[in-house]
Amino acid sequence: LPVVVNPHGGPWARDSWGFNPEVQFLANRGYAVLQMNFRGSTGFGRKFTEIAYGKWGQTMQDDITDGVNWLIEKGIADPAKIAIYGGSYGGYATLQGIVKDPDLYACAVDYVGVSNLFSFLQTIPPYWKPMLDMMYEMVGNPEKDAQMLRENSPALNAERIKTPLLVVQGANDPRVNINESNQICLLYTSDAADEARSV
């Protein structure tokens, strides 16, 4: 089957059983949809949440890739017809997925996704400022963890992208600044492989 991988936002949130209109829309049109509660998702205990601290784009992303590979191994997914699509952290996971595993996905849709962990941490909304130290623990500290943040910022590794990509962003998004999308669009269109196109 063609598959749409749909990592949830947050990442400190979770997918749960119940009606989801986006998923139902895709399933109604013949797509299998993979949603997963990767490390860091809430509702599975403190340890499950905390093992994701400082692991954006790393083991959290590996959980998503492992799910996709499982679908391929079980014969559920057509390996040539796998898309990834998500918003907010799910948009980040979409971008990191096509950077880290450029041959895994046939296409990608990022909406309001973080593309540069440095600029994301610099532009958090005012109501998150009291939690900045906690954000540094959960995402990474720009001074102490600079190499890790650089390696896991899709915009700073856009030259690896070969996958056709659609980027969607609201101009006034209070949580994920429009600059996140501007960066990935600018770097993707200048550095991406010839066969990839941006919209």
What is the role of each PLM region?
Residues 11, 18, 40:
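Active-site donor-sugar recognition loop in glycosyltransferases
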Residues 15-16, 177:
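Alpha-helix N-cap/helix-start motif
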Residues 11-13, 33:
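Serine-hydrolase catalytic-loop signature spanning alpha/beta hydrolases and amidase-signature enzymes
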Residues 13-14, 116:
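Short beta->alpha connector loops of Rossmann-like oxidoreductase domains
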Residues 35-190, 197-198:
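Active-site-proximal cap/loop segments of hydrolase catalytic domains
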Residues 1-9:
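Short beta-strand element of the alpha/beta-hydrolase
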Residues 18-35:
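Short amphipathic alpha-helix adjacent to the substrate-entry channel of hydrolases
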Residues 9-11, 89-90:
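Acidic helix/loop microenvironments that form the catalytic cleft of cell-wall polysaccharide enzymes
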